[in-house]
A protein has these predicted regions:
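Solvent-exposed, flexible loop/coil residues
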Residues: 8-14, 34, 42, 56, ...
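Adenosine-phosphate binding glycine-rich loop
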Residues: 61-174
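Residues within well-ordered alpha-helices
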Residues: 18, 56, 80-81
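Short glycine-rich anion-binding loops that position phosphate/pyrophosphate groups of nucleotides
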Residues: 48-50, 74
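Rossmann-fold NAD(P) dinucleotide-binding segment
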Residues: 29-40, 50-67
């Protein structure tokens, strides 16, 4: 809890320096290096688009990653993403699904504003959880329907396309 509290304090104060955290808690810090060489069960690239290339993807996989969660918008090149998805035991959560939470929260805020409502934090969280669970379920079901197993990237692409196509057809746009 102390470490999380310190991270929250750093974030809110604008002192987002990893070095400060490393010094306070006595952990290794590698200035100027990217984290892809560190052994980890969970990897969450969250900086910028196309930051993870094939070389880094191979390094990440070799280090035993189990969950690769794209927090940034498309942080992984297509080649690297395909490689990670092909690795046994690696689950890839695609950025379009992961980042939907931020978009959904904005939509919930707009809904509150347009109806002049005020929801509690718990109500917003419950609605957001439902939306994110639906996205996950739709992604899994789409991947399974098209024989793609547990490929969340393909499932999210298919489910997203299907929703847009259905909306266009409902509007008479072909």
């Amino acid at each position: 809890e102390e470490k999380i509290a310190y991270l929250v304090e750093m974030r809110s104060s604008g002192r987002n320096r990893v070095q400060d955290y490393a010094e306070k808690f006595g952990v290794e810090f590698f200035p100027g290096e990217k984290p892809w060489g560190v052994k980890a069960d969970v990897v969450m690239p969250s900086a910028m688009q196309n930051d993870v290339h094939m070389e880094q993807a191979k390094q990440i996989a070799a280090n035993g990653v189990k969950y690769y969660i794209e927090v940034a918008n498309m942080p992984t090149t297509n080649e690297a993403l395909s490689y990670l998805m092909s690795q046994p035991g690696v689950i890839v959560a695609p950025s379009k699904a992961v980042n939907a939470g931020g978009v959904a929260t904005s939509a919930l805020e707009m809904a509150q504003n347009s109806e002049r409502l005020v929801w509690t934090e718990e109500e917003v969280d419950q609605r957001l959880r439902q939306i994110m669970n639906n996205i996950y379920t739709m992604s899994v079901e789409a991947a399974e329907k098209y024989g793609l197993g547990y490929n969340l990237v393909a499932g999210a692409n298919i489910a997203g396309f299907q929703r847009v196509a259905d909306a266009m057809m409902a509007q008479g746009i072909f």
